[in-house]
């Protein structure tokens, strides 16, 4: 159910504070949170007045989002992007004010998408290990990349740059070494921060520092704070060349004023001017569509009648555990779950809130905050994959504006 702008559901409170709905219910029972009283509303919302005592809500209610989005580059800032995919990160950075000079991507369908939308972009379609970046040495302001993180063996030793040879981490580090950009932005799954107790990330950070960079930011960003209607989380690493460390100061972007929902993505409103256009998409087999019709909005397999739940889950039904992604239907009034490379995968179901079908490709794109005129190339499966792997455009925009502000504030000699 949709509440007034100064009222928030338990689900939105939980998402914002990174706690479970059960936590919110417990706080309500012990008086830490007191929902608004309205006999006409079954689900009692929480008000702005009591939520602003939480740091996350206070930051939203007192945000400088509009002022930060209004900042324009004071000079031309150049961008190189690695592992560019379908262009979510590059597009957001373009909207922030960066000018792309080179994008590298090996997937032919993603490259076709990039060229269809930005014919003027210099898209290098090749494996990154075949690309020479030395001609850009000292000429690039920002290098970015969402590098796929492959496992590497360290066997108790302290690894350096050459020890990572053969991995995509090495190739991104090589590009940084050859280009020597003023700033780099690396993004990855949030799990990288916890992999091997943080050892993998520590090795990557050390290699980047050994190449002559200081880390300004190393944090997991929640996309819901940056005008993205999706519970996506990404590890963001921002580094600056050591000789510029005392001249550049990064400040994390302010959050958007509210958490957007699936309804904001698919219906006309503050995110899009019109309802989502029709587009291609996968369909369920007839029996699966029948089964999903029993799942209520926001529900999952545990909401199925017991007989149907056993049929659908098979052996998994008896194994216990949450398995909350199975037979999962999205809710209109909550952000989407993190999009994956296919909306109909059994373990990570992404069913439309009110229709018994997977999300279409354009619905997928909207939840990732791509504009409706961004055209994707390839088969339906390839398009889902491109969108599911992308950085949300609005998240990239927010980070890009923060980097623009940092560069604008730098002394002139940084660019001489």
Curated annotation (Swiss-Prot):
The keyword S-adenosyl-L-methionine applies. Keywords: DNA-binding, Methyltransferase, Restriction system, S-adenosyl-L-methionine, Transferase. The keyword Chaperone does not apply. It catalyses: a 2'-deoxycytidine in DNA + S-adenosyl-L-methionine = a 5-methyl-2'-deoxycytidine in DNA + S-adenosyl-L-homocysteine + H(+). It comes from the Bacteria. It is an enzyme of class 2 (transferase). Gene3D superfamilies: DNA Methylase, subunit A, domain 2, Vaccinia Virus protein VP39. It comes from Psychrobacter sp. (strain TA137). The active site is at 149. Its EC number is 2.1.1.37. InterPro entries: C5-Methyltransferase, C5_DNA_meth_AS, C5_MeTfrase, C5_meth_CS, SAM-dependent_MTases_sf. This is Type II methyltransferase M.PspPI.
